[in-house]
Amino acid sequence: PTLGVLDQRLLYWPIGNGSGIQGKRVVEQWQEAMTAVRLTGGWLAGFIDRPGKRSVLTMLHTLDLDNSGRKISDLYRFDSDIFAGLTDTDLFDTLLQPGERSVVFVDVSQHNNTFAGRDAHNEVCFFYLKTGPGEGHLARVDIPLWVARDKAALGSVHALLVDQCRIIGSYPYVITRADEIAVVGRRDQEELENRIALLLAEQDIHPSATGKQRSKDFARGGKTRFEG
């Protein structure tokens, strides 16, 4: 089977206007694409580098609650105070060794209920993966329920991602390579930037590049294809 790896979460939801007509249609198309992958026999995974969620910590906290009637939404609202800035990354970065993964969890959210309501196989699950030695090399990997329930598929996805991360160090090479291919050529990029600059200048807007963008430009300038 073919594995499709995205550099984002599988539980896609538009920011801001997700409940609008256009937002709902985009989500439906995303879900339809997930179903299409399953029907072709493929696998899906969403790779989130250095995740900042507290899903597992919140779950663990519920086990220590005396008030069983407390709403999950209340836990998420106050989790920053409860955990003093800690995230799931802090937990699993300590527990896992390079190449190891956590058990599989189900994403508990209303958005995930929407996904499962449309196609039960598309309910999003996840696990944490230690992608390299030392601190800071931890990823959250989203997988659909149909992959999570198939032990062979789950094992293969785990092994493939570990193998990909070993090629260039703690990040899947296939995603890096996709970024290389998707990068606009220098001449086209300069033409596009000039047009954007002219439009911004007309509005008396003079933006400066962020540190992140400068680092991406520098890295892309010297990339070469991996020959393994």
Predicted segments, located by residue:
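Phosphate-binding glycine-rich loops and their immediate beta-loop-alpha structural context
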Residues: 5
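Long, contiguous domain-sized segments
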Residues: 8-228
